[in-house]
Amino acid sequence: MGQKINPIGLRLGINRTWDSRWYAGKNEYGKLLHEDVKIREILHKELKQAAVARIVIERPHKKCRVTIHSARPGVVIGKKGADIDKLRKKVADITASDVVINIVEIRKPELDATLVAESIAQQLERRVAFRRAMKRAVQSAMRLGAEGIRINCSGRLGGAEIARMEWYREGRVPLHTLRADIDYGVATAFTTFGTCGVKVWIFKGEILEHDPMAQDKRMAEGDNSRPRRDAA
């Protein structure tokens, strides 16, 4: 049987780049990697309601720059920037270095695979019919300009005794085409019947130039996201 690998990992270095962008020698690499994991865990825990899709960590000399991609930047910033100051202190406690937090607003969350997957998972937890949740997400993505979308839901769907997998697809999702700009996201719904897994693939067109930063540039220049605020 053919298995589907993570389409983001397959395209790293082609039209997508890493979410942790720094270099370290073998003596420090493990320590910095653990710091990255802790930073992401804390931010996702603190920003559950902020619709965070992606956290990019860069480490210039003796600094740590964290870029949070969120559909609700106001929730991240808080009243008069109070919440973002708390986040900066928590991250600084982990890294023991100067921390800069940037926020990028995702203007079309319906085209972000991670946010779509989390939205469907939340609906499953609220006992919304899984077919309705999947169909609504597919229609929203296609209406806003996606060239294709596929959604998989697996588990005890609708409280069934036997777990199964259901999927919807509209348009085309060319997983083998390396120049394809495919976003991928996963989420888990914790229902009273057990856990249900949600996977989402969204095809946004092709990136013809060979540039690892191409996907980030497209997001910055296009309508999907825009810088909201730089917090020094």
Curated annotation (Swiss-Prot):
Subunit structure: Part of the 30S ribosomal subunit. Forms a tight complex with proteins S10 and S14.
Entry-linked NCBIfam families: rpsC_bact
Name of the gene this protein is made from: rpsC
UniProt xrefs under Gene3D superfamilies: 3.30.300.20, Ribosomal protein S3, C-terminal domain (3.30.1140.32)
GO molecular function: mRNA binding; rRNA binding; structural constituent of ribosome
Entry's family note: Belongs to the universal ribosomal protein uS3 family.
Signal sequence interval, chain numbering: none
Any one Pfam family match given in the protein's UniProt record, by short name: Ribosomal_S3_C
Protein name: Small ribosomal subunit protein uS3
GO process terms (BP): translation
GO cellular component, one term: cytosolic small ribosomal subunit
Lipid metabolism found in the keyword field: no
Keywords for this protein: Ribonucleoprotein, Ribosomal protein, RNA-binding, rRNA-binding
Domain KH type-2 intervals: 39-107
Function: Binds the lower part of the 30S subunit head. Binds mRNA in the 70S ribosome, positioning it for translation.
Alphabetical list of InterPro entries matching this protein: KH_dom (IPR004087), KH_dom-like_a/b (IPR015946), KH_dom_type_2 (IPR004044), KH_sf_prok-type (IPR009019), Ribosomal_S3_C_sf (IPR036419), Ribosomal_uS3_bac-typ (IPR005704), Ribosomal_uS3_C (IPR001351), Ribosomal_uS3_CS (IPR018280)
